[in-house]
């Protein structure tokens, strides 16, 4: 099954985590890269690809001391900015998705987002037809996802992880078609660590 890009939220051994994967038929020549300790970006291997689509390069993860934000586009930054301004996480998520709306490409691709903070996680999606944002008080060994295609309703997965790198690797290895690159954020004490995986080298 081809589901496009997707975000996940999970909890393993009392630690929250969030994951992201790029699956792509149109722009497979991309990679995930950590930018410092608080950011992961999706970048094209050929900068000329940016002329073909404005949606292929963005910060897919940003972390604050107690919050990790994971999305499939530039709304990562908008959500973080609203949280920093003092908005409740649910409101920051909903307002950013509503303001930026679905991607205006040939497929009307949804914008999706995940946020994890302390003991609570959030998923959101905005499509051409509507907006859905939900809060999940995560129990141990729980995992949920939402994707841009096919799995656009929040659904459960069976995934556990013990590090950010393992989150990224497990996102990449899920059986959905056309994996390109993946990233993860994993709660360690009072902060989040970041990991990326760009497939077999």
Curated annotation (Swiss-Prot):
InterPro entries, A to Z: IMP_cyclohydrolase, IMP_cyclohydrolase-like, IMP_cyclohydrolase-like_sf
Catalytic activity: IMP + H2O = 5-formamido-1-(5-phospho-D-ribosyl)imidazole-4-carboxamide
GO biological process, one term: 'de novo' IMP biosynthetic process
Pathway, per record: Purine metabolism; IMP biosynthesis via de novo pathway; IMP from 5-formamido-1-(5-phospho-D-ribosyl)imidazole-4-carboxamide: step 1/1
Bilayer-spanning residue ranges: none
Alphabetized UniProt keyword annotations: Hydrolase, Purine biosynthesis
SUPFAM superfamilies assigned: Archaeal IMP cyclohydrolase PurO
EC number: 3.5.4.10
Record flagged with keyword Ligase: no
Molecular functions (GO terms): IMP cyclohydrolase activity
Main EC class the enzyme belongs to: hydrolase
Superkingdom, natural source: Archaea
Function: Catalyzes the cyclization of 5-formylamidoimidazole-4-carboxamide ribonucleotide to IMP.
Family: Belongs to the archaeal IMP cyclohydrolase family.
UniProt protein name: IMP cyclohydrolase
Organism name: Methanocella arvoryzae (strain DSM 22066 / NBRC 105507 / MRE50)
